[in-house]
Structure formats: structure tokens, C-alpha cells
Amino acid sequence: FEYYPPKTEGGVSALVHKRLPSMAKQRPLYIDMTWGAGGSTSDLTLELCRQAKELYGLEANMHLTCTNMEVEKITKGLEGARAAGIRNIVALRGDPPAGEEKWQAVEGGFTCALDLVTHIRKEHGDYFCLSVAGYPEGHPTVIKDVAPGQQLTPAEQKRVVYSTDEDGGEKLQVCFDADYANEIAYLKKKVDAGADLIITQMFFDVEVLLQFVRDCRAAGIAVPIIPGIMMISTYAGFKRMLGFCKTRVPPTIAAEIEALKDDKKGLTEY
């Protein structure tokens, strides 16, 4: 289960005293807690991970990102994790800060998750279990528009994302084969640098995930791959995440969700 640090005291209390103990009954392998750009939630993220572990025996997997993070901040975050008894880190580049479209490294900071994994292994050896992100459909930044009449390979056809343009017409996007191969090669570099497992971006097409796993294994990536599954709570949230992640939704599933868009209870149960 993945959690975002709440923005209010009431939200924090509800998470610690209601949601975490309720979720703990499901006996998850771990819970992970996100990390705000520039360490904006660092203290709260650390405290929530500590409480999840101490109060409910949950294995905490703490996000750590490169966004607006000087090396000194990353060092402080890792030291805080060790002090709190947290031994699991999700090493990520991170998304651009709110209001910005393009990701940029801070001066003297890391440029990617590979840099972060390499740094953690160099400074902390095998103390931390490191997770990294994997993208079965390709990272959103390399999922590109398909030109009208452009031919796609069989592999690309299975990854193609259907959406609508500003005029309501059909729009096709895909991570082309060359970019997809680069994605797999980069993922292997992260694993070779010391990542212990891969957590995937959310997906709705199981065949896309299975092909991703096959491609990883063929590339020599042998670490466990944990599927990332989005729990749909609202139609608006579902559509927002589709746009943000550029996720493929099989037509049958898309039609079923569309039919439930005004039925909150039915959508949650779905």
C-alpha cells in the first residue's frame, strides 16, 4: 500500500489511527510512503514510516527522490531513515515540482535514480534494501504521439495508449520500440548498480506487464518485479492518473469503468 503524507493534522491522525491499522489487517508485504519535492515532507514521511513500523509492525519502504534535493539533503534523509530503523528505500528521480513541466536537477544534485542508487550503495553498503521504478509501457516522457497513418510494430500495437485530443477525437500514443529498449537497458543499469527489486508503474493491461517481465528477464534482470496496482476510488482521480502516467486501458475495462463513472460505490467495488 502506498500513502501520501497528509497535509493536515486531522489527516495525519486518521492515517495513523484508522487507515494504517485497518490496512495492517491485510498483512501487506510492505507499505511505502512518498517523499515531497525538495524534502518538503521529509520529517513527516520519516515519522509516518517509524510509526507504521513501531505501532503496527508494518515494513516501511520510504521514498527518496532527487527532485530539488542537494546531496546534503539526501544524506540527511538517509541518516534519518537509519535512525528510525527504516531499512527499505524506494530510490526515484521524482516528478517535476508542482507547476513545472520539465524536470531539472539542482546544482550539484543527482540527475537520475541511477545516481541515487549508486550513491546509497557507496555510502551505506548493503544496509538498505533498494527498490526502483519500472515502466511496463515506458516512462511517460518517452510515450509519444503516433502520427496519422504511421505504422506500428506488433510490439508497439500492444503498448499503444488510446486517449482523446482537445477536440474529442481519438489520439494514439506509444513508447516506440527503440525508446522501450532504452528503458529496459536503463532499468538494468539501476539493478546492476544495486537495486534489489522493481516496483512497476500502474497498469491495467496484464499482457503489457507480462511482456515487460519477459523483456526484463531476457535482458538479464533477475530481481523480483512487484506489480503496481491503482485502487480506483473516483472517476476523476482515475482519469487524472491516466493522463499523468499515459496508461493503456484495454477497451473492455475502459467501457466498464465508463459505465460506472457516476456510481461511486459501484466504481469503488469494481
How should these model regions be labeled?
Residues F1-G36:
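N-terminal beta1-alpha1-beta2 module of alpha/beta enzyme domains
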Residues F1-P6, L29-M33, A60-L64, I89-A91, ...:
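Hydrophobic faces of well-ordered beta-strands that scaffold small-molecule active sites
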Residues K25-T67:
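Active-site cofactor/substrate anionic-group-binding motifs, chiefly glycine-
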Residues Y30-T41, L64-T65, I89-L92, D177-D179, ...:
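Catalytic beta/alpha-barrel core
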